[in-house]
């Protein structure tokens, strides 16, 4: 892939469109460890709607191990407080379904069902710096199976 190819792309889908390649054939390095992402990691990065990072006109993504590790670092460094849905709505001025909330473990955007799950189960969302996080159903289940679920982390 040339350095100029797709230099305005924000997502892997846009990058592939602009460079005229398919997602499974994309070879992209991790911004943190510089390893080449496996096909499954490329697909997971795209599915999670994460953004491409540009350095010196080259695109980077993040491998699964680094996403998990740096996600945990972000939790520890930037945790502000935990709050229930009404507080999130009051603070943002949006309904909980309109607020962009990502999973604090896998980083995918929470679906309306996943946000509703927090409300029904009376579980708090987490304020990290300027963004809100919670748990997707997949990560929620993994945390519950391990018995690690707490109000501040999994």
From Swiss-Prot:
Keyword DNA-binding set for record: yes
A Pfam family assignment: E6
Record key words, sorted: Activator, DNA-binding, Early protein, Host cytoplasm, Host nucleus, Host-virus interaction, Inhibition of host innate immune response by virus, Metal-binding, Modulation of host cell apoptosis by virus, Transcription, Transcription regulation, Viral immunoevasion, Zinc, Zinc-finger
Residue intervals of every unnamed zinc finger in the record: 30-66, 103-139
GO molecular-function terms, A-Z: DNA binding; zinc ion binding
Positions in coiled-coil regions: none
GO biological process: DNA-templated transcription; regulation of DNA-templated transcription; symbiont-mediated perturbation of host apoptosis; symbiont-mediated perturbation of host ubiquitin-like protein modification; symbiont-mediated suppression of host innate immune response; symbiont-mediated suppression of host type I interferon-mediated signaling pathway
Record bears the keyword Ribosomal protein: no
Origin superkingdom: Viruses
Gene Ontology terms: cellular component: host cell cytoplasm; host cell nucleus
Location relative to the cell: Host cytoplasm; Host nucleus
Any further remark recorded for this protein: Belongs to the low risk human alphapapillomavirus family. The cancer-causing human papillomavirus E6 protein has a unique carboxy terminal PDZ domain containing substrate but low risk E6s do not possess this domain.
Function: Plays a major role in the induction and maintenance of cellular transformation. E6 associates with host UBE3A/E6-AP ubiquitin-protein ligase and modulates its activity. Sequesters tumor suppressor TP53 in the host cytoplasm and modulates its activity by interacting with host EP300 that results in the reduction of TP53 acetylation and activation. In turn, apoptosis induced by DNA damage is inhibited. E6 also protects host keratinocytes from apoptosis by mediating the degradation of host BAK1. May also inhibit host immune response.
Family from the record: Belongs to the papillomaviridae E6 protein family.
Quaternary structure (record): Forms homodimers. Interacts with ubiquitin-protein ligase UBE3A/E6-AP; this interaction stimulates UBE3A ubiquitin activity. Interacts with host TP53 and EP300; this interaction inhibits TP53 activity.
Stated name of the protein: Protein E6
Higher taxonomy: Viruses, Monodnaviria, Shotokuvirae, Cossaviricota, Papovaviricetes
